[in-house]
């Protein structure tokens, strides 16, 4: 945590708020997630964070879209609390016995460490070029700002004044949902959402491929082989897709390849 504060400076607190809310949401939604991932050693621990965001975020979106509630921080907190309460109730009354992977808590610990470190490193890297410039970044940021100002969905189109969005905005919406839920600012969470996705793109493939290798190899496989396979999967999804400039801009240039 000390290293995170040193790397991120004033952005550290927003980063920690997001990381903590993700941890809490994942914990609360384990009764549901464990039922889906009951064949996994970690009971889908890291997937629980994503499932929580999807369920709570979709709940807020649908109720706002049909004009039952306004899209505010208060409504986001209330609906998230109700969804979380439903998950806890399911765990208590749904005869779900194996909710937490007590026998594999070391695995859960290391998955959390991996998620935190990758999330931190991507956030630190994003700080070198945080501007919403290039490709669709300006539009993404504009959509998010529009939704932050609005209490209805879809929000007013920043390109076509007086009209609502006539474009898919799911990714931007979930970013704003988490922003309103945590009481943070789009100026920071615009990049934080991108780096969070990159962190999930590492740890989710890690969990999945590690489990696949363990199931495939059985007792023939050593612990380090399944873990190494999971790490390779995480690197392939989260890192390799961002190597275009390094490969084409640097390596090919050094090798004289055009």
Predicted features along the sequence, with ranges:
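Active-site lumenal/periplasmic loops and adjacent helix-entry segments of GT-C-fold
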Residues: 12, 16, 20, 106-113, ...
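Membrane-embedded, hydrophobic transmembrane alpha-helices
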Residues: 1-106
């Amino acid at each position: 945590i000390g290293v995170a504060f040193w790397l991120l400076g004033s952005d550290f607190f927003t980063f920690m708020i997001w990381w903590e809310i993700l941890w809490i949401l994942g914990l609360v939604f384990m009764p549901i997630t464990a039922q889906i991932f009951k064949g996994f050693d970690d009971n889908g621990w890291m997937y629980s964070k994503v499932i929580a965001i999807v369920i709570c975020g979709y709940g807020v979106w649908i109720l706002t879209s049909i004009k039952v509630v306004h899209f505010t921080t208060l409504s986001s907190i209330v609906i998230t609390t109700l969804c979380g309460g439903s998950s806890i109730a399911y765990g208590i009354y749904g005869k779900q016995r194996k909710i937490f992977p007590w026998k594999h808590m070391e695995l859960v610990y290391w998955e959390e460490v991996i998620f935190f470190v990758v999330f931190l490193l991507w956030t630190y890297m994003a700080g070198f070029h945080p501007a919403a410039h290039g490709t669709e970044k300006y539009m993404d940021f504009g959509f998010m700002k529009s939704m932050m100002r609005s209490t209805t969905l879809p929000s007013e189109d920043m390109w076509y004044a007086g009209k609502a969005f006539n474009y898919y905005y799911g990714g931007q919406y979930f970013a704003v949902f988490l922003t309103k839920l945590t009481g943070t600012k789009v100026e920071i969470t615009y990049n934080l959402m991108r780096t969070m996705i990159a962190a999930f793109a590492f740890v989710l493939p890690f969990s999945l491929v590690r489990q696949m290798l363990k199931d495939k190899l059985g007792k023939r496989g050593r612990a380090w082989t399944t873990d190494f396979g999971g790490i390779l999967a995480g690197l392939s999804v989260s890192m390799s897709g961002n190597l275009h400039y390094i490969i084409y801009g640097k390596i090919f240039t050094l090798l004289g390849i055009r």
